[in-house]
Amino acid sequence: MNESNQVIRDAKKLGLPKMLILGVQHMFAMFGATILVPILVNSYFMDACGEHPTRGLTVAVTLFCAGFGTLLFHVCARMKVPAFLGSSFAFLGGFSTVAHLNTGIYAGMSANEKAAYACGGVVVAGLLYVVMSLIICLVGIKRVMRYLPPVVTGPVIICIGLSLASSAISNASTNWFLAFVALAVIIAFNIWGKGMFKIIPILMGVVISYIVALIMNAASFTNPDGSAILNFSSVASSGFVGLPPFQICKFDVTAILVMAPIAIATMMEHVGDMSAISATV
């Protein structure tokens, strides 16, 4: 094995500049999926209630909680597991179900009220995580892993990933040309890249495709639906610092039974992810 292909076990050997570049790539890799969850959730409530919830899941809060949760995870893991904790797409089905509930107390309910009950179900799902963590502390991870082997966690991860195919196709269909540019750049750098460029294909795909989008936008090209390729109006009108709208979660058995059991699937996904990462570091 030559020097350029040697596995680096200690990231500090890369030096600060390369560590920062890899960190930026990791940020871009997680960014799209993390912010897509609140966007999709809001679209579910829009379809069901005819309005976007002004409270509940927001992009800013999602990013903040993902960052805070990741830092807390690294403290608990003593900086030994290079993982990022972002949004889980597994809960999308639950949010969609709650958004479309129109019986009982949910009849005629606004999007904000339904979002409050859905978030209450997520809180209970979080409590299930706490219970599982206590069980692991009491009986040990080895005993728990007997019931969650790779043959169980692997298919769960695959199913969750495959369920996102429709979202990926829908997003790419906004502008197939830019989607192809990003994909082609990532594949090219991953296969033929040299040195540092070979390990940052996602970052290069984002940068180059964004430059292409800027050029197309300046040349007055539009998306197939006639919308602008890049629109900075919402960025210009928003404040540099602001607080998100707060809402107290509400609890109902129906919403809890819809949302909380999803935690079982995400637990298996999480265990599978951690096992895969642990096998490579």
Feature roles, as predicted:
Residues 17-33, 53-61, 77, 81-90, ...:
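Helical membrane-embedded segments and adjacent short helical loop/helix-boundary regions
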Residues 50-60, 104-121:
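Membrane-interface alpha-helices at helix entry/exit sites of multi-pass transporters
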Residues 66-87, 136:
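Juxtamembrane transmembrane-helix boundary signature
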Residues 100, 113-220:
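Membrane-embedded alpha-helical modules
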